[in-house]
Amino acid sequence: MQFQIGDMVARKSYQMDVLFRIIGIEQTSKGNSIAILHGDEVRLIADSDFSDLVAVKKDEQMMRKKKDESRMNESLELLRQDYKLLREKQEYYATSQYQHQEHYFHMPGKVLHLDGDEAYLKKCLNVYKKIGVPVYGIHCHEKKMSASIEVLLDKYRPDILVITGHDAYSKQKGGIDDLNAYRHSKHFVETVQTARKKIPHLDQLVIFAGACQSHFESLIRAGANFASSPSRVNIHALDPVYIVAKISFTPFMERINVWEVLRNTLTREKGLGGIETRGVLRIGMPYKSN
């Protein structure tokens, strides 16, 4: 069967566990062609011989997407419940501090989201919009992120920075602790380090970094508050959104329990982890509607 760029495929050698789209075709040193693959719902990049690929039919694609949407909706509902409880708590706190009750307003933390995948960036921006997180989205190749981040931080002045895209671990290239055995972990680490040179304090700029199978420990050591992937598993395309939404909607006087953040994600503690971090939401008053 002839495959083309844009085709939806799965790999026979992996029991067709992940749905991919073909994003490129390259020639190996031996002269044969291989397909470059991006996960359709997970942030995984891979390459494959065409002989290992099988086309995924439309009905199978729809079935997988419906299952994925169901999981996404569960996570979104958890976020909405958390935010509802937060608003009720803050309403009580804000009005109980003053003799005259005034209307108040919320200022959620601003997010700068750098993504190596333009299609995933669009998906993430749609979810940010649904849940009301203020965000600036930038499509940037993983290898160019480190050189771009200082200018972007000056321009957008975010409270939260997301550094993500695609990644993968290859045991043929080295051991699990060897950063050179990962497709883009090194570039994510360099970007975090550059951002931290500019804004060292962990609570002045909250950073999420990583993608599928990323080198979690190196990202945390570089200065990320949250990162992937402790067990080197795949993470969902929207997992970064669920993490930063929780941070964005948590008041800056409160510390965020790491498990409280991870429970809203699709991958949870096998794919994501982090350190104790302050929220970035601020509350003000009075609020005057037009």
Swiss-Prot record:
One of its GO terms (molecular function) is hydrolase activity. It is found in: Forespore outer membrane. Keywords: Hydrolase, Membrane, Sporulation. One of its GO terms (cellular component) is endospore coat. Cleaves the spore coat proteins SpoIVA and SafA. May cooperate with tgl to mediate the temperature-dependent cross-linking of coat proteins like GerQ. Belongs to the peptidase U57 family. This is Sporulation-specific protease YabG. It comes from Bacillus subtilis (strain 168).
